[in-house]
Amino acid sequence: MLRALARSTSAALVLFAACSDSTAPSPAQPGVALAVGGLHACAVIETHTRCWGRGSRGQLGIGVTPEDSTPVTVAAPPLVSLVAGTAHTCGLDAEGNAYCWGSNEDGQLGTTEPIEACPLPCATTPKLVAGNLRFQVLASGTEHTCGLTMDGSAYCWGLNDIGQLGTTAANESCTDGRCSRVPVPVQTTRTFRAVTAAIHHTCALDVAGLAFCWGFQLGTREKIHIHPEFQPEVTAMPGGLAFQQISAGGRHTCGVTGAGAAYCWGIDAIGAGPTPLESDLPVPVAGGHSFRSVYSAGLTSCGLVDDGSAYCWGPNSYGEIGTEPVGSTVRFNLPTAVSGGLRFSALAPGGSTYCGITTAATIACWGRGIPGGPSDSSVPVTVPGL
């Protein structure tokens, strides 16, 4: 049975992920931390970290393995939350120490401990993140990681090729461009309560619910996908609205207000109907739903309503919308109910895959290459062996 984790509201916020997102609400089954990466997933169950899916870069934390369809136990300290990137995984212990494992090609593990070659730089067991920092939340992008310290200061590490670390100081040379191999402070005097990261951008919420983003697709009136920003820039909220939660996808970001209204901006999954398919400012998600949380990854987004039903929107290339039809030209521009009738307490987004913690205390996944599952699926598939 899936059981509990929740050291605080803000700590539980980090559990979702990509990849992973620190602003989702804590699950109804406290204690189950869940994160989805590129083609792998991890969960904390009763203080034990278990991972499954692709492990070719050490992201399962048990060495290098092509794939493990059955969850395996990671030799990690007791963790209370998880996030995951394309090929790396990170978690926090109860004291706020951060540990990461998997690919370190671009410094996304943030460690000074010895690493291996898989054959590229990686860590097949958890490594302590450098800097003697204590974090309340983490968020993972594709090849970078960010965290908020106990006082709300933002730090990031990993790839910085388009400003996703929020600093001009990350100028080390990594596989895919400039980077920082250890945590560096984001160039801002603001403090934050939540953070979310994607491929080339990162966003955070301050205590008032205002969104600040850096990197790519910032949600301002400028064409930010042409001119990336290397410092946080406030996202323009229509009508002065503030968000209670925010989640970054591949080229878009979505947020939900305290009243349950969802807004998105960027390219692809903005959920505004047939048009527009992109917006440089936040636009309301159509369909008339009141969401308690939203989750974005890749080209899609999903939201949960009060009864735990999941609705998704965007392209359905691999079944990530959770319904038929599936295909490279199929897209759902309005929130569409995920099939199967499951009710979820929380979701974890990752690339073209979604997993969720159900109200029946199971984990189910749908979309591309279901971690530990049969392949692509447009219907949620329960993960066995948890």
Task: State where each predicted segment sits.
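Bacterial N-terminal signal peptides that target proteins for export
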Residues: M1-S10
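Bacterial Sec-dependent N-terminal signal peptides
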Residues: V14-V32
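Beta-rich catalytic cores
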Residues: P30, G37-G38, E67, P78, ...
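Conserved core positions of repeat-based scaffolds
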Residues: V36, H40-A43, C51, H88-G91, ...
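Short glycine/serine- and acidic-residue-enriched loop/turn motifs that recur at repeat junctions
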Residues: G53-T70, W101-T125, G158-V182, F212-M237, ...
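Surface loop/turn motifs at the tips and blade-to-blade linkers of beta-strand repeat domains
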Residues: T73-A76, V129-G131, V186-T188, M237-G239, ...
